[in-house]
Structure formats: structure tokens, C-alpha cells
Amino acid sequence: MRNLITIIVLFSGFTHVCFADNHKKAENAPEPSIYVVRHIEVDLEKAKDFEAAVETKTKKYNRKEGSDLWFTWKVISGPRTGQYARLFGVQSWADFDKANTSNTINIPRGNEESSYWRENITPLQKSKSVPTEVWMVIPGTEYNNLEAGQATRYGALYKWKMKPGMYQKKTKYEIQMSEALAASDLKVRGSVMRFESGGDYMTFGRWIGFNTWEEFGKFREWGNLGKIYEAKHGKGTWVKYLEGWNTIHQDGGETETEYLEYLEDLSSIELD
């Protein structure tokens, strides 16, 4: 399955996530702008059975040309450690109006794929009903320093809450940071998204996809992010960025970071 176009997320979900156009490589295909993420809890003793069941379902419904694309990540740090993030992406809100698809917010009960999930996988979940999030990508924040079509094995999601009325400034700052990361030599990809549903509307999430912890460490190395930012925007801009950042976000607002691992056997796209 190497002839595929891949993007992450999240993020978004998380962001870029893997995505394909009829499972054929199309480097100029539009990337999704909206992601729907379902967070699934499974008891530890049922985790292996759950993963095996989702793998079987994926091979049956989500690996053929023209099939609905679904992607599974496992949270490996943070408050939701051990949970599964099951998601898909669409290019516009109008895509949610399409019939005969599982790639929609409210899947019809008569959908064959949905029925299969309810019969074979739902019994392995802690709850029949799972929390669902909708995230929308902020235009201009996407970047990709990896080869076209390359999936990412890991992802990091950072969430902050802005102050009301700061949307334009928040967008400006996130675009500037994405420009700096895009101009760097870091082998990462990512974007910034905003909660549309399922959480605090003031919440933004920055997704970073990577393939090795060594490469991610270059991003997290103390002081390195400031150097990356100033390499793009000029000397002294990092301090100004931090000062502005503090005025944009809620004082004492909840922040959260979590790391995730991509489960290729439970997803439409395999890793290279």
C-alpha cells in the first residue's frame, strides 16, 4: 500500500493524519480541513481482542479503492493514556452530507460498516457511546518537511486556551510558528486546529507528526525552538513572540500535551 498520499494529523486530529484519495497517490490532492475524532476506552484485558477486531474490520472495509478511510492512534502519554483515537478527515463541511458513508459525524445505523462495528467491536469497548471531537485546521498553519506520501509513526498534540476576542492574533502567531517550522531542517509535519465541537471552543491544538524520538528531541531541545523561530523571522523576534503569546492565552488556563502512536494495522494507510 505504498501508492498513497499521507497527511497528519490529529489531530487532529489531531491533525495531520493519514489520508488518501481512492488509495492512489495524488500529491496535489487537497488535504482535509476538518477532522472527526472518536476517543475509545477499552479495558486492558480486552485491548488485544479490540485491536484484532479493528484490524479485521479495517481489512474488510477500509483498505479497498474508494472505501471510507479511517485511522487509529493510541494515546501513550497524558490523561488519556491507553485510549484509542479513531478518526477521519474531510475537505469541507458539505462532505458530511454525503450518503452511504461512515465518514460523517452521525453515521446512519443502517450503514453496513457501522453495523459491523456495533456487532463485533462495540462489545469490547468500555462504553457503547464514545466522546467525539470535531477539529478544523487553521489555514496557513500546515507544513510538511517529510517526503510526499510518508506517514508518521508518532504524533504530539499540544492544546492551549486563548482569551475571548484573540482569534486573529492567535491565528497570526500560529502561522508565524508554522512558517518557522516549515523553514527548519526538522523532519516533521503538522498544523494547528481549533475545537469546533466536543470541547472548549477557546481551545487550539498544535499537532506535530514525526518518525523518531531523536528527531522530535531536536524540536524539544531546550532553547532550540527560539533559534528555529529567529532563523526565519529575525533576531529578537522570539522574545516578542513570547510576550505576545502571554497576552493571547488565558491566565491559568488549562494546557495539555499528549503523545500518540500510529497503529497501521488498524488504519487505512500502512507505514513505509
Segments and roles (model prediction):
Residues M1-E27:
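Bacterial Sec-dependent N-terminal signal peptides
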Residues A20-D272:
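Short S/T/G/P-rich N-terminal loop/turn motif that feeds into the first structured element of a domain
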